[in-house]
Amino acid sequence: MAIKALRGMKDILPPLSEKYLNFLQTASHYAHNYGFSYIETPLLEETALFKRSVGESSDIVGKEMYQFIDKGGNDIVLRPEGTAGVVRSFIEHKLDRQGGTHRFFYYGSMFRYERPQKGRFRQFHQFGVESFGEPSVYEDAAIITLAKAILDHFEIDYTLKINSLGCPVCLKPYREELIKFLEDQEHICDDCKRRRKLNPIRVLDCKNEQCQQIYENAPKLINNLCEECNQEFQTLKNLLDNEGIIYEVDENLVRGLDYYTRTAFEFVSNALGAQNAVAGGGRYDNLVEMLGGKPTPAVGFAIGIERILDLIKDKPVQREGYFIGVMLPEALNIAFDIATKLRQSNRVIMEYKPKSLKALLKGADRNNAKYALIIGEDEYNEGLVWIKDLERKEEKRVDIQNFMER
């Protein structure tokens, strides 16, 4: 019986892998332009990191982590999200003690044991950015603008939703008001019944349709913001308005992780069905301190790459580079020299087995080459190479030495 990839985990093969690399290169370029530097953290982390950051009442920690005890007796987990690991690295390398602003971007695999479905996998990929040390709401606006720039580059249709999750000052009275509301709700799902005692605000993130209808009448955090949080949210909206960024205020948007405070946002697409969030993030000013670091304001976002790839429109295949082949074995060394030189600045595919002209041209077409370079018997004897432009359908024979010296 053949061994296959695990359920919910997929190989990324051409042509999808080309689209994947193009997304990473483009997103990295935009992040660099916004002042972010690349960071890479391990796939494995201590389980305690996510229990303290994501929250023990979250679905991720409660149901979805790939958690195990290693041979050394350590309780470890395959990372389910990227932010906590970056924060851990930020603290471990004492960047929280340096002051100033530190901006990082990252990409890589994340793991969650959940039911695979469209737009949701057990191994998935994220591109994310994290900014540490800048408390200004202008940084929140810049982060949202960066995410928008990446999505706009790929001509993705989306709706931007924003909300404010307040601060500890606003949350305490709101939490009490929400608990009082939830006590009378007997038709919510079992998960929400469990959460209403452990972390009542998390119920608003429930995707159950009946629960969502009930929560339409729940008290809204945005109506309970303290003066400072309310002013900051108004400033954020003004900044987005000034940039011509269209958004909706979603009063039930709370994100799926416990560490967010104040600004929260999501980019959603109707083209994805139930799993419609393509990017999301917000501010998490308390997380660095929660994980043992010096109090540091922070804000960031993550983009789900698989969902983005589903939305990026396929473009016509562009011919690129050279296909090199020979019709006699004696010409292989010369052809190999040509390939080595061209590969310094071009994509080159070489066929090592001598074939007929017809077969070689089929190979060039199959590999979407722009040019076919072929050495037949006559070319070999005369020191020439036959070149065909497969887009323009033009062909010529040129001196090999002159071609190599170009």
Curated annotation (Swiss-Prot):
Entry similarity comment: Belongs to the class-II aminoacyl-tRNA synthetase family.
In terms of InterPro entries, this protein maps to: aa-tRNA-synth_II (IPR006195), aa-tRNA-synth_II/BPL/LPL (IPR045864), Anticodon-bd (IPR004154), Anticodon-bd_dom_sf (IPR036621), His-tRNA-ligase (IPR015807), HisRS-like_core (IPR041715), HisRS/HisZ (IPR004516)
Which SUPFAM superfamilies does its entry note? Class II aaRS ABD-related, Class II aaRS and biotin synthetases
Reported EC number(s) for this entry are 6.1.1.21
Highest rank taxon of the organism: Bacteria
Give the enzyme's main class according to its UniProt record, as a single word.
ligase
Gene Ontology terms: cellular component: cytoplasm
Q: In which organism is this protein found?
A: Nitratiruptor sp. (strain SB155-2)
Q: Which UniProt keywords apply?
A: Aminoacyl-tRNA synthetase, ATP-binding, Cytoplasm, Ligase, Nucleotide-binding, Protein biosynthesis
Q: What is this protein called?
A: Histidine--tRNA ligase
Reaction(s) catalysed by this chain, per the record, are: tRNA(His) + L-histidine + ATP = L-histidyl-tRNA(His) + AMP + diphosphate + H(+)
| GO BP field | histidyl-tRNA aminoacylation
* Molecular function per GO: ATP binding; histidine-tRNA ligase activity
Q: Where in the cell is it found?
A: Cytoplasm
- Subunit structure and binding partners: Homodimer.
For this UniProt entry, what is the primary localization, expressed as one broad class? cytoplasm
Pfam families under this entry?
A: HGTP_anticodon, tRNA-synt_His
Instruction: List the gene name.
Output: hisS
